[in-house]
From Swiss-Prot:
This protein's UniProt keywords: Transferase, Tricarboxylic acid cycle
Pathway(s) per entry: Carbohydrate metabolism; tricarboxylic acid cycle; isocitrate from oxaloacetate: step 1/2
Protein name per UniProt: Citrate synthase
Originating species: Thermosulfidibacter takaii (strain DSM 17441 / JCM 13301 / NBRC 103674 / ABI70S6)
Active-site residues (renumbered): H274, H320, D375
UniProt keyword Transferase, yes or no: yes
Similarity-based family: Belongs to the citrate synthase family.
Reaction catalysis annotation: oxaloacetate + acetyl-CoA + H2O = citrate + CoA + H(+)
Signal peptide: none
Lineage: Bacteria, Pseudomonadati, Thermosulfidibacterota, Thermosulfidibacteria, Thermosulfidibacterales
Keyword Signal belongs to the record: no
Stated role: Catalyzes both citrate generation and citrate cleavage. Part of a reversible tricarboxylic acid (TCA) cycle that can fix carbon dioxide autotrophically and may represent an ancestral mode of the conventional reductive TCA (rTCA) cycle. The direction is controlled by the available carbon source(s).
NCBIfam families reported for this sequence: PRK09569.1
Length: 442
């Protein structure tokens, strides 16, 4: 496989570079670590390495240095499906892994590899899912299905056989190819079992990774294929410090294989503070539609936004921990909606919110970022095309996030980074020594 051959050339170079950095600059500060960091979820603490993506306040996420508009529209546009516009996530995965823009041939090779391996999901995985009550939360089923596949791990087998550390990334790559191929199959199986009468659809060997997920869920429409390609591209990676990405790296640092680490990551993603935002936005938009009997006027929405804020509530889908501009992932989804569903009533409310709410938040004065984030839009797109099972939205998020999590895991195993082991402190210690500690920046 050309991807593996290219990584075999790049990873030894990167490993040497990382070793040199650790040797030369290992005692340099990235920033001051404060008591506030320890009690505040380590928010903003520069203590992890992630080379696949970086989030900038004024540009949003960059995948290996490229912005979303660059990769989606040019000048570095990723390959697309025949007759399509949206980037194929297979191409993004190549970029995340290598740091290089893929050719059409690179993308076709990865896509063909995924399609071939989709046929290899063991029957016992489906048996595990069938043994669970049908009303089990889809994210619980998703995490269980992933973990059930651990029996197939190449990394685990080779580690038991005494695999050299320099070879860890190769086994991680093989597991990642198998898991990424299996995820659409598992996700679609859960969807059909829970919501579509337990009838199931096999993968289509002629479809790409994202389109096959839509197909196996029962949505054979080119616009849905394009939406899934865009969705998987946009939600794929967002640095290494969010709950799902960090969980994946933490568990993986103990030499747990990708099935174990990514299953753990999905349990983090299932938490309401991480993976439920787009559902909350959609419910809020639908509540507005019901309250006003359709699309509200600008004045009605402005008054309702003020009432919401003055009652101490937040407006879902607006604001971001890092961004200080409209999330480029939101802009890409808005562009898709303007092209494919400009007359959708819920989209009209989303557009009106974009016009009204930032100005209200600016006047309110408490929001550091009054602009919409990625979650302000995605639920409405899924709803429009008939995917109306709120609880399943996080599974789609999880399938997408696997692209970034696998790429990060392969790279850190290539760098041969050690197990994570930060030092904890006690509240008693803080009370005893806090007054004597220097203030950050002093």
């Amino acid at each position: 496989m050309k991807l593996k051959e290219r990584l075999a050339e790049l990873i030894p170079q990167w490993r040497a570079e990382v070793a040199e950095i650790r040797k030369k600059y290992g005692n340099r500060k990235t920033m001051d670590c404060t008591i506030g960091h320890a009690y505040g979820g380590m928010r903003g603490l520069k203590a992890l390495v992630c080379d696949t993506s970086e989030v900038f306040p004024d540009e949003g996420v960059k995948f290996r240095g490229y912005t979303i508009p660059e990769l989606r529209e040019g000048p570095h546009k990723l390959p697309t499906a025949e007759g399509g516009f949206e980037p194929l996530p297979e191409g993004l995965w190549y970029l995340l892994l290598t740091g290089e823009l893929p050719t059409e041939e690179d993308v076709k090779e990865i896509s063909a590899e995924f399609t071939k391996r989709m046929q290899n999901v063991p029957q016992y995985v489906f048996d595990v899912l069938r043994a669970m009550p049908v009303d089990t939360h889809p994210m619980t089923m998703f995490a269980a299905g992933i973990l059930a596949m651990q029996r197939e791990s190449v990394f685990a087998k080779r580690y038991e056989e005494g695999m050299r550390r320099e070879e860890h990334w190769e086994a991680m790559l093989e597991d990642s190819l198998n898991m990424l191929a299996a995820l659409p199959v598992i996700a679609a199986y859960i969807y059909r079992r829970k919501y579509k009468g337990d009838t199931h659809i096999a993968p289509d060997p002629n479809l790409d990774w994202s389109a096959n997920l839509a197909h196996m869920m029962g949505f054979d429409d080119f616009e849905v294929y394009e939406l899934f390609r865009l969705y998987m591209f946009l939600h794929s990676d967002h640095e290494g410090g969010n709950v799902s990405a960090h969980t994946n790296l933490l568990v993986n640092s103990a030499y747990s294989d990708i099935y174990r680490s990514f299953s753990a990551a999905m349990n983090g993603l299932a938490g309401p503070l991480h993976g439920l935002a787009n559902q909350e936005v959609l419910r809020w938009i639908q509540m507005l539609y019901k309250k006003f009997g359709g699309v509200p006027t600008k004045e009605q929405l402005e008054r309702f936004a003020w009432d919401t804020l003055n009652s101490g509530q937040v407006i879902p889908g607006y604001g971001h921990a890092v961004l200080r501009v409209t999330d480029p992932r939101y802009v890409a989804q808005r562009d898709f909606a303007l092209k494919h569903l400009p007359d959708d009533e819920l989209f009209k409310i989303v557009s009106l919110c974009y016009e009204v709410i930032p100005e209200v938040l600016k006047k309110h004065g408490k929001a550091k970022n009054p602009w919409p984030n990625v979650d302000a839009h995605s639920g409405v797109l899924l709803w429009h095309y008939g995917i109306r099972e709120y609880d399943f939205y996080t599974v789609l998020f999880g399938v997408s996030r696997a692209l970034g999590c696998t790429a990060q895991a392969i790279l850190v195993r290539g760098y041969m980074l050690p197990i994570e082991r930060p030092k904890s402190i006690t509240t008693r210690w803080v009370k005893e020594v806090a007054e004597s500690l220097p203030v950050a920046g002093s």
